[in-house]
Amino acid sequence: MEHKEIVIGVDLGSRKICAIVAEFKEGILRIIGTAHQDSKEINSKAIKRGRINSLAHASNAIKEVINSAKKMAGLNADEDRNNPMPHFGEYHPKTKAIVSFSGAYTESIRDVTGVASTKDNVVTIDEINRAINSACAKAGLDNDKHILHALPYRFTLDKQEVNDPLGMSGTRLEVFIHIVYTEKNNIENLEKIMIQSGVEIENIVINSYAASIATLSNDERELGVACVDMGGETCNLTIYSGNSIRYNKYLPVGSHHLTTDLSHMLNTPFPYAEEVKIKYGDLSFEGGEETPSQNVQIPTTGSDGHESHIVPLSEIQTIMRERALETFKIIHRSIQDSGLEEHLGGGVVLTGGMALMKGIKELARTHFTNYPVRLAAPVEKYNIMGMFEDLKDPRFSVVVGLILYKAGGHTNYERDSKGVIRYHESDDYTRTAHQSSPTPHIHSSPTERNLSDLKAPSAPLNTAKNDDFLPIKPTEQKGFFKSFLDKISKFF
């Protein structure tokens, strides 16, 4: 009988929930259904910056999106919901999902090393697996932590640096890795909510990683590139160098803050400020330039829509431009903090919903003057077909990246959120992708190997948690912008 697998990608974003249903058949991954809800349709109590705030509210929102995508795909949306779930853990949905995870609730450890000795003087995937797990154990994470990604970026074999040690002769393999982890409670809550939504988690991928998979070229990753997923309430930065992830950072700024600035500064309710941003947003505007329309009439806060006032269009656009510039300054500081600024031959790539704002690329280029800047949307690659036109949009980079991750878009070697080693036999990602567990995976000519007995135990480590929401620290501003930013800084 012909093997067919259904997989779902689910992006739990700050301002929207997205789902893609894909089918694996005859070595090809084909998208057959998609759905999403934006912030106007999602209960604000459900999800905040990617974190589950209410199991009941979140499960309803996620379930609705997933079922809509299933219906488009011609699947029975209720096939998993008809089974009772008296207790968590007693119910196992038929459908599996790859789910995004917000960088807001992760920490990372850089430059951790692990060592493994070879058998028969040849490096196999077993030795690479043991070296990676050795590094994870050496990181000394507490038992209440969960590793999402362990990402090797450098190998040495008998003290000689090599790009890919697999199959090479040698006795001592050393690996240098970048680890991304979170609290186990976060993972357990995510698992509960997804089961209540009718799917079982197959894997978890941080959103910035998923976005980079969907948008970056192999050349950019090899040269070094900073990929910024610009969302509603967050920006998530991932930096590649030498085709490996070297740095990731969550930044508590997004397009939502432009709306908040407009609401406070123009004395208008938030929903109207959002409409103003969408209708009149143009980040290419600079003070003193002529605009098509000089004034805009907007409702006044506290008047229940019965009173309005006039504001210059130039003021609206200047407010948004100043906040966007401040966002790029924050992103730039994070790039500098990474120590990798001199390794960005591929420049800066912007994706996510905020990247759709008119003039954002031109504004970014005025700030990032030392390297190229481009806007990116998802593209078809890694044996994936059926990309709907609606998905070729920066807003859907993360959810498309989740499916591409399944299709082999992960880095050359990786220990994933399930503790499984994923790898490619060469740097050419169009070739066969492998994983070390017996779980079927989407790609042509899969190789399955069970290395679960090679997992290394965890050891204690006390680490500081990420701040839930960090304040924006603006640089010196002139005129009313300084007063305004000082006034509202406490809100962010």
Swiss-Prot record:
Belongs to the FtsA/MreB family. GO terms for cellular component: cell division site; cytoplasmic side of plasma membrane. It is found in: Cell inner membrane. SMART domains: FtsA. Its main location: membrane. It holds the Pfam family SHS2_FTSA. The keyword Cell membrane applies. CDD domains: ASKHA_NBD_FtsA. Residues 288-307, 429-458 are annotated as: Disordered. Residues 436-447 have a biased composition (Low complexity). Cell division protein that is involved in the assembly of the Z ring. May serve as a membrane anchor for the Z ring. It comes from the Bacteria. This is Cell division protein FtsA. Keywords: Cell cycle, Cell division, Cell inner membrane, Cell membrane, Membrane. Self-interacts. Interacts with FtsZ. One of its GO terms (biological process) is cell division. Residues 291-303 have a biased composition (Polar residues). It is a peripheral membrane protein.
